[in-house]
């Protein structure tokens, strides 16, 4: 049986169709918003997965190019692996949903979002979050708390829910809010230095609209939702838990109060060995239960320390940032480097400048675009002292790279101000919490060292949270380290300048954040951010005046757009010859701006510009030019006076005396002075050598 339900969000129709497709899926829905359609399929394994200590949730976001009427490029002509954007959207769906599954649920759950139709005014990624929540709620999978999502823009001082393409072009805020009907679950934002109060108001504005979408989901569940399965929840054996806790609690507590991380970890390993010696024979088949009890005991001790004893594992106050050091210029041949250290977290970011032609072309379901500024993040195993194979970037690395990229994007100068492509690479050298925000700080240092005239320096910080089981008591923590992140309830990352916020990403491990918690986290992050910015400015107060001697050099010239064809030539013949002869890169814009770039050959840039100017320069009647003879005939000589522009010197105009043979006066390859005597209505240029000589003699006499 097919079930349909509709509602209105921001003046546009949102609709769900259930039972129409995917008859063998636990739940399959068509979710539409305007002409944007996403199909969501939710399924779960029948039994828990054995031998794991986590919830195996898998979220996929699949973009189909037919959704926008495109055929994939390349030889294969079909979609390949998910794009970085698809991976980011999948992570955005995962984060608000994961905390709302029952604790101890170990069944495999997969949510597949397939984008079928896209109207650019209505973002499919926002619809996919709503659809994933609704599909889970309609299924028999034990997920019962609906989550809604909206996009919030800020145009001319007004907040807008789910802004259209035209509105997104003018917004100074790009905010995604996910919430239940009671609390905010997840926020992602990019903004042009938004103040904390405005950001808080925007989040609350989005939260209110989320409540309406949650009500829509609840109505759908009440009308045609499936009966929920009784979940099988993992729980450590009660006898094992009791005995291990009695034996080890005091030892674990003593260890967790050690401030030094390395010493704490070393002592914890010894405690685990003692526990193993004590119980390995008695509970030989209960090793997973023993590990679970150790984890729960550590968590209990750390959370009690923070929540009830007002003490942090490393002894800092709750609003204190770890010791910071900043360095620049540490690599001799790169274009810019920044080494940022905060406690045991250390990131080195390297800036590389390239020609405008080095931009990354983005090909997907969105409108065609390119990226002139990009940030990549690498998290090798040695950063946490572990041994594992080095592979390509995973979802986490892609997500952290995008987050740091978004933090600095509003501060990057325009291509007119700084005509270069910019690539930043953040190498995590040591990780003990908030490496993504350390990457923001390292990136700022690298950009300043590279001489990039960013609007203002940016910095980032991660805020944490500890709450009581009933969520009544909560404490916000500044600059969380690894242990506080691992056992805490929130990771609230905020980056920005002294003027305002440029990016936010937060998610929780509990059923959402209170309004006060959001406000406190924003204010705490501002205080910490200003402190870090002070340290950055002490290291390098402004961008370097000169680029690295190893960086490319770019010059800009402007020509009449009508002359672009003269520079390119038939089939690109002329421009390719210029590039080959001068060893430069040339980028031509539709408005007539031409960017000429060379790595280490400034003379090549000058030569290329000279050629381009010659190609686009108009021949002026009455002017004298130094030209090169390209051809001789029995009636005269053809002379190139500007690149691609030739005129004829008639034999009678070659000399004052009578000339019997052209070759008696000039030969091919000779450079001679000529005067433009006439340009006829067909554009043919008539030249005179003797008039040029006469004029020069006249000027000499004066």
UniProtKB/Swiss-Prot annotation:
Domain annotation S1 motif: ranges: 622-690
Disulfide bonds: none
Pfam family, one: PNPase
PROSITE patterns per UniProt: KH_TYPE_1, S1
Primary localization: cytoplasm
Residues annotated as binding Mg(2+): 485, 491
Known EC number: 2.7.7.8
Listed InterPro entries: ExoRNase_PH_dom1, ExoRNase_PH_dom2, ExoRNase_PH_dom2_sf, KH_dom, KH_dom_type_1, KH_dom_type_1_sf, NA-bd_OB-fold, PNPase
Any one GO cellular component localisation term in the record: cytosol
Record key words, sorted: Cytoplasm, Magnesium, Metal-binding, Nucleotidyltransferase, RNA-binding, Transferase
Superkingdom per UniProt: Bacteria
Domain KH: start-end pairs: 552-612
Alphabetical list of NCBIfam families matching this protein: polynuc_phos, PRK11824.1
Protein name: Polyribonucleotide nucleotidyltransferase
Source organism: Clostridium botulinum (strain Kyoto / Type A2)
UniProt lineage: Bacteria, Bacillati, Bacillota, Clostridia, Eubacteriales
């Amino acid at each position: 049986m097919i079930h349909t339900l509709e509602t209105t969000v921001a003046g546009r129709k949102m609709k769900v169709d259930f039972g129409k497709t995917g008859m063998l899926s636990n739940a399959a829905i068509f979710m539409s918003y305007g002409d944007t359609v996403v199909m969501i399929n939710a399924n779960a394994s029948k039994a828990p997965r054995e031998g794991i200590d986590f919830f195996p949730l898998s979220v996929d976001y699949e973009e189909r190019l037919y959704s926008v009427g495109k055929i994939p490029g390349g030889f294969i002509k079909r979609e390949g692996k998910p794009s970085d954007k698809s991976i980011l959207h999948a992570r955005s769906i995962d984060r608000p949903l994961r905390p709302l599954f029952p604790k101890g649920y170990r069944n495999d759950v997969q949510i597949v979002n397939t984008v079928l139709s896209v109207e650019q005014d209505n973002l499919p990624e926002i619809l996919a979050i709503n659809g994933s929540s609704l599909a889970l709620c309609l299924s028999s999978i034990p997920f019962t708390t609906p989550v809604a999502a909206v996009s919030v823009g800020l145009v001319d001082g007004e907040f807008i829910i789910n802004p259209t393409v035209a509105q997104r072009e003018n917004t100074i805020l790009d905010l995604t809010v996910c919430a239940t009907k009671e609390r905010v679950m997840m926020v992602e934002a990019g903004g042009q230095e938004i103040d904390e109060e405005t950001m808080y108001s925007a989040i609350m504005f989005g939260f209110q609209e989320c409540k309406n979408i949650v009500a829509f989901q609840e109505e759908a569940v009440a009308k045609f939702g499936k009966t929920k399965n009784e979940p099988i929840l993992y729980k450590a054996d009660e006898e094992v838990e009791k005995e291990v806790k009695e034996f080890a609690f005091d030892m674990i507590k003593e260890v967790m109060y050690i401030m030094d991380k390395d010493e704490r970890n070393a002592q914890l390993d010894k405690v685990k060995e003692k526990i193993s010696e004590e119980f390995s024979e008695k509970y030989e088949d209960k090793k997973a239960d023993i590990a679970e009890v150790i984890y729960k005991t550590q968590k209990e001790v750390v959370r009690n320390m923070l929540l009830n004893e007002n003490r942090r594992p490393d002894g800092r106050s709750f609003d204190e940032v770890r010791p910071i050091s900043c360095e620049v210029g540490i690599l001799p041949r790169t274009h810019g480097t920044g080494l940022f250290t905060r406690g045991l977290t250390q990131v080195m970011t390297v800036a590389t400048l390239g020609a405008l032609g080095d931009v990354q072309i983005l090909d997907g379901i969105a409108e065609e675009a390119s990226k002139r500024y990009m940030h990549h993040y690498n998290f090798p195993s040695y950063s946490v002292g572990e041994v594992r194979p080095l592979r390509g970037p995973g979802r986490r690395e892609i997500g952290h790279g995008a987050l740091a990229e978004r933090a600095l994007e509003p501060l990057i100068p325009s291509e007119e101000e700084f005509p270069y492509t910019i690539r930043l690479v953040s190498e995590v050298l040591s990780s003990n919490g908030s490496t993504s925000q350390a990457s923001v700080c390292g990136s700022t240092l690298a950009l300043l060292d590279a001489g990039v005239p960013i609007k203002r320096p940016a910095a980032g910080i991660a805020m944490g949270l500890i709450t009581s089981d009933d969520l009544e008591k909560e404490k916000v923590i500044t600059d969380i380290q690894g242990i506080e992140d691992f056992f805490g309830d929130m990771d609230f990352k905020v980056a920005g300048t002294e003027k305002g916020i440029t990016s936010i990403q937060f998610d929780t491990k509990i059923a959402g954040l209170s309004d006060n918690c959001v406000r406190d986290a924003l204010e705490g992050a501002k205080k910490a951010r200003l402190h870090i910015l002070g340290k950055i400015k002490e290291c390098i107060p402004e961008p370097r005046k000169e680029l690295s001697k190893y960086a490319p050099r770019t010059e800009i010239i402007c020509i009449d757009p009508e002359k672009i064809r003269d520079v390119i030539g038939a089939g690109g013949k002329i421009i390719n010859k210029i590039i080959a002869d001068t060893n430069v890169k040339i980028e031509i814009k539709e408005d007539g701006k031409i960017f000429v770039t060379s790595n280490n050959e400034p003379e090549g840039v000058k030569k290329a510009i000279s050629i381009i100017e010659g190609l686009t320069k108009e021949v002026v009647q009455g002017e004298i030019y130094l030209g090169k003879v390209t051809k001789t005939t029995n009636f005269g000589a053809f002379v190139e006076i500007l690149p691609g522009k030739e005129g004829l010197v008639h034999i009678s105009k070659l000399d004052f005396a009578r000339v019997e043979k052209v070759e008696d006066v000039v030969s091919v390859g000779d450079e001679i002075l000529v005067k433009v005597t006439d340009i006829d209505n067909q554009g043919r240029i008539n030249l005179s050598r003797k008039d040029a000589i006469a004029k020069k003699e006249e000027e000499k006499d004066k």
